[in-house]
Design a protein with these regions (language model features):
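HhH-family (HhH-GPD) DNA N-glycosylase catalytic core used in base-excision repair
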Residues: 1-175
Length: 175
C-alpha cells in the first residue's frame, strides 16, 4: 500500500536488464499477507506443486472456515493434520505452531529485527530454511530486503549477475 512502485521502476531503470524486466512485468506487486498465513503457507509449499499447495490450503481453510491462526491450531498434532494430506510438512506445521505459541520464536519482534536475525529466528522452526524464511519475511513481515531464491532465481542470478546485484536494488532486493 505504501510502496512507491514508480520510484522503484526509476531506480531499476539504472540497470538495462532490470529496466527490461520492469517493462515486461510491470504489474506484479508484493502481497502483504498475515505473517502466520505466510509462514504456514510457505511451509506447506516446500517441494510441492501449485495444485497440491492449493489443495492443502483449501482443506485447511475448509476445516477452519477460513485461514486459521496459530492460536486456532494450538491443539493440532501430526496425526490430527492427516486430513490435509500434507505429508512430511505436517510435522513442520506442528513445530511452527508450538514455537510461535510458546514464544520460543519471538514472532512479535521479527518485524523490527535486522534481516539476518529475523531469518535465523524463523529458521529455528523445523523445516524452515533460507527460502521459506525469506518468503515469510518478504510477504508476511514486509521486509523488502528479503530475497527468496529458488533454483530458477539462482540460475538467473548466476547468468545475469555473477558478481552480485546492482546497487540500484539495495534494500529492496525482494521486490
Amino acid at each position: 500500500l505504501n510502496t512507491d512502485y514508480g520510484e522503484l521502476k526509476r531506480r531499476f531503470s539504472e540497470n538495462e536488464t532490470l529496466s527490461k524486466a520492469c517493462s515486461f512485468a510491470g504489474g506484479i506487486r508484493i502481497l502483504r499477507q498475515d505473517s502466520w498465513e505466510a509462514l504456514s503457507s510457505f511451509i506447506i509449499s516446500q517441494n510441492n506443486n501449485i495444485p497440491r499447495i492449493k489443495g492443502i490450503i483449501g482443506r485447511l481453510c475448509e476445516h477452519y472456515s477460513g485461514y486459521p491462526s496459530a492460536e486456532d491450531m494450538a491443539d493440532e498434532t501430526i496425526d490430527s493434520l492427516a486430513y490435509l494430506r500434507s505429508g512430511f510438512r505436517a510435522k513442520y506445521l506442528v513445530d511452527a505452531i508450538e514455537k510461535v505459541l510458546s514464544g520460543e520464536i519471538d514472532y512479535q519482534k521479527i518485524k523490527e529485527m535486522p534481516l539476518d536475525d529475523a531469518r535465523n529466528e524463523l529458521m529455528k522452526i523445523k523445516g524452515v530454511g533460507p527460502k521459506v524464511a525469506d518468503c515469510t519475511l518478504l510477504f508476511g513481515f514486509y521486509k523488502t530486503d528479503a530475497f527468496p531464491k529458488d533454483v530458477w532465481v539462482k540460475r538467473v542470478l548466476a547468468q545475469w549477475y555473477p558478481n552480485g546485484l546492482p546497487s540500484c536494488v539495495k534494500g529492496v532486493e525482494g521486490i
